[in-house]
């Protein structure tokens, strides 16, 4: 299965539209959103074209393709408007023999690990910085941010397909790869 993985839309209609265009272009079967879907939070500037109602409409239109975990900016009020679940703290995916623990990153992260077995993968957003770090017992992956990238990183997403991870800018240009 081909997964598109993205994080931190933060209510930007512009970047949500760009992400969904990339999702269609990539022909991925599922889109995993790692939280912070609608609200920008008090620590971030407003993203371009901040319009949460438009983001709701766009994402509800592809609800059957979405898997989402809760970010620190996501609330029960957001869930009342969205037609797909967003309040799970984590999701578990399997890629071959490896388990992927997908979460937002504000609770569990490199500094505070969830219960992982040797060889598992910790996947989270939250920092807005794309990463791929091989630790002794686990692999840490971050797709970066769709709308508010940090540390001079591009507006980005991640593709997971057949054991290969490819980080891409929203225009589809690959800039980092890793094979599991």
Kindly give the residue locations of the regions a language model identified.
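Binuclear metal-dependent phosphoesterase catalytic core
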Residues: 2, 92-96, 134-136, 140-180
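Internal catalytic-core helix/loop-beta-alpha segment
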Residues: 83-131
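Thr-Gly-centered strand-to-loop micro-motif
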Residues: 6, 103, 142-143
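Alpha-helix C-terminal capping segments
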Residues: 59-62, 80-81, 113-118, 160
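Core catalytic region of metal-dependent phosphoesterases/phosphodiesterases
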Residues: 2-95
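Hydrophobic/aromatic beta-strand patches that form the interior of the parallel beta-sheet core
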Residues: 32, 67-69, 121-123, 139-141, ...
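Active-site environment of divalent metal-dependent phosphoester hydrolases
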Residues: 10-14, 39-41, 72-79, 107-113, ...
């Amino acid at each position: 299965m081909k997964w598109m993985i993205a994080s931190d839309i933060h209510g930007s209609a512009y970047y949500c539209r760009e992400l969904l265009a990339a999702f269609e272009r990539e022909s991925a079967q599922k889109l995993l959103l790692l939280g912070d879907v609608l609200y920008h939070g008090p620590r971030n500037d407003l993203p371009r074209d901040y319009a949460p109602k438009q983001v709701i409409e766009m994402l509800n239109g592809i609800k059957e393709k979405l898997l989402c975990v809760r970010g620190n900016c996501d609330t029960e009020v957001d869930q009342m408007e969205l037609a797909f679940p967003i309040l799970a703290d984590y999701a578990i995916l399997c890629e071959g023999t490896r388990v992927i623990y997908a979460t937002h990153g504000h609770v569990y992260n490199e500094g505070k690990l969830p219960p992982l077995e040797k060889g598992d993968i910790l996947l989270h957003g939250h920092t807005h910085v794309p990463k791929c770090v091989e630790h002794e017992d686990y692999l840490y992956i971050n797709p970066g941010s769709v709308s508010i990238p940090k540390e001079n990183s591009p507006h980005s997403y991640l593709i997971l397909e057949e054991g290969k991870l490819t980080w891409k800018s929203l225009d589809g240009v690959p800039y980092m790869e890793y094979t599991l």
